[in-house]
Amino acid sequence: MTKPISLSNRALYARLLSYVRPYWKAVFLAVIGMVGTAATEPVFPAIMKYLLDNGFQAKDARMVWLIPMGIVTLFLVRSVIVYCTGYLMTWISSRLVTDLRRTMFAKLLALPTHHYDEHSAGQMISRLVYDVSNVTDAATSALITLVRESLTAIALIGYLLYLDWKLTLITLAIGPVIAFTVKSFSKRMRAASQKSLQAMRFISHTIEETISAQQVVKIFGGQERQQKQFFEATEQFRRAQMREAIPASAMTPITHIAASVAVAIIAFLALSQSTGQAGASAGSFISFITAMLMLISPVKQLATVNPTIQRGLAASESIFELLDAAQEDDRGKRQLLRSKGEICFDNVSLRYLGAERFALNDISFRITAGQTVALVGASGGGKSTISALIPRFYPVTSGRVLVDGIDINDITLASLRQNIALVSQNVILFNDTVGANIAYGSLQTCSRDDVIRAARAANAWDFIEQLPNGLDTPIGENGAKLSGGQRQRLAIARALLKDAPILILDEATSALDTESERQVQAALAVLMKNRTTLVIAHRLSTIEHADCILVLDQGRIVETGTHAELLRAGSYYANLSRLQG
């Protein structure tokens, strides 16, 4: 498995903010707005100072109107700036979420097959949904708080220094206390946040697994087991959140206590007139206290934003782990335009990542253009593994796989796979229409007539015509509205439409009734003519006419020959034939 990346908080946050860089103009405008908001903060205590020192004694009638109007104007301007800043940051946040999810999804499509073997669908879904939300909070919401409250604090501290720099420096002694508190709690919150993310991935995995296996759950009475697993997952998440809440909740009261001590010191020194200007007049004193109390809010916000940042950093580690994962090796430079269909396995061995034994051992065989070769043997013998090596779903451990005499590692993945059609016993359909499932991916440019011809050849047109909207009928999640045989025939129609020179059939007719199988076999016989076909078969009756049959056992080829030759040999294949009657 891919190990989590290890970066310092600063490097991790810098990388996270790099995704905000394309929107620097909007960020710049938002920062200007925050500067404007911060600049208005000291104005109110300054007005209070003037009001207390001069307002009640002043005889100027204009001040009776100017001061109230100034207060209203101040908060009106501030409100407009806050609105514009909030809207801009929300826009940036939505763009960041979209960009991150698109980048991650594109990465998912480029990951090698073994990555999907090691990570559940629920875990990957959680990364795209939950982790991205946490990262966005850290990169936008937390950024707003950091910039806005820092600027506000700077503006208020500047005003306090203007009123009485000595008293201000004394009260700023609480700064190291708050900084120490934040630093000491950050590591604990980061660890707790990582536990929360892991627990959320387990929740997503449990939900995804239960939904996809709902029929098995019902028929085998697994509701209690799945519910227990889900309860355990949610309990893990709750406990992780509570561990995160301990330091997060403690930071605010500690900040308040430190601030209250500072205010108490100010009050004592001002009232005792042991310092200068702040205690010189009632206006100065009230203005100083007001500014000091206003300073508590940004300080508190700066302290409480840390949990959001730590959650975002923990989530960004998970996201960057995915983004930094190795993609499929596609260093091949040669384009395979239209393959002849010649396939050669040259002393191929394969051991899956983390496996102790080899799945394939020294496999060698050659398929000439247009030949039909069948792979038979017990489950786990290596049949599906061989078929997975041709489109390079897995890299070989040793040896070579060649197509038209070219090592497939030297061929671009796209052009190699363009020459291969696959029909698996595990039919995959998409939540779309019948026609879109047949003309899927690169086939979507095919004409409607071509789609109909493929459906007819796969013995699927009769049932398609009976559907409410024919080819335009939605089929539900993975073809849930169709029968097993209908789903299988759509997959065959998709392969027929692709018209690739290399065809891989993994028990492609297993879900068909006798009559449908007869018709599909006839259609496949036409399709297989002058095409190289690799058939993985469990029922030997389906491969009697294969040009060559390879019998596999525990990752090795133990017999080779035609159906008749292998029966006459009276060995492994003949025993399989007798067992199937």
Swiss-Prot record:
Species of provenance: Albidiferax ferrireducens (strain ATCC BAA-621 / DSM 15236 / T118) (Rhodoferax ferrireducens)
Protein's name in the database: ATP-dependent lipid A-core flippase
Domain annotation ABC transporter: ranges: 343-579
Catalytic reactions on record: ATP + H2O + lipid A-core oligosaccharideSide 1 = ADP + phosphate + lipid A-core oligosaccharideSide 2
Domain notes: In MsbA the ATP-binding domain (NBD) and the transmembrane domain (TMD) are fused.
Function as written in the Swiss-Prot or TrEMBL entry: Involved in lipopolysaccharide (LPS) biosynthesis. Translocates lipid A-core from the inner to the outer leaflet of the inner membrane. Transmembrane domains (TMD) form a pore in the inner membrane and the ATP-binding domain (NBD) is responsible for energy generation.
First-tier enzyme category under EC: translocase
EC number: 7.5.2.6
Residue sites binding ATP per the record: 377-384
PANTHER family (UniProt xref): ATP-BINDING CASSETTE SUB-FAMILY B MEMBER 10, MITOCHONDRIAL, ATP-DEPENDENT PERMEASE MDL1, MITOCHONDRIAL
Localization annotation: Cell inner membrane
SMART domains from the UniProt entry: AAA
GO cellular component: plasma membrane
Keyword Nucleotide-binding: yes
Residue ranges crossing the lipid bilayer per the database entry: 27-47, 63-83, 154-174, 251-271, 279-299
Keyword Coiled coil in record: no
Main location class: membrane
Subunit annotation: Homodimer.
GO molecular function terms attached to this record: ABC-type oligopeptide transporter activity; ATP binding; ATP hydrolysis activity; ATPase-coupled lipid transmembrane transporter activity
Record keywords: ATP-binding, Cell inner membrane, Cell membrane, Lipid transport, Membrane, Nucleotide-binding, Translocase, Transmembrane, Transmembrane helix, Transport
Family: Belongs to the ABC transporter superfamily. Lipid exporter (TC 3.A.1.106) family.
Membrane topology category: Multi-pass membrane protein
InterPro entries, per the entry: AAA+_ATPase, ABC1_TM_dom, ABC1_TM_sf, ABC_transporter-like_ATP-bd, ABC_transporter-like_CS, ABC_transpr_lipidA, P-loop_NTPase, Type_1_exporter
ABC transmembrane type-1 domain ranges (all copies): 28-311
Coiled-coil positions: none
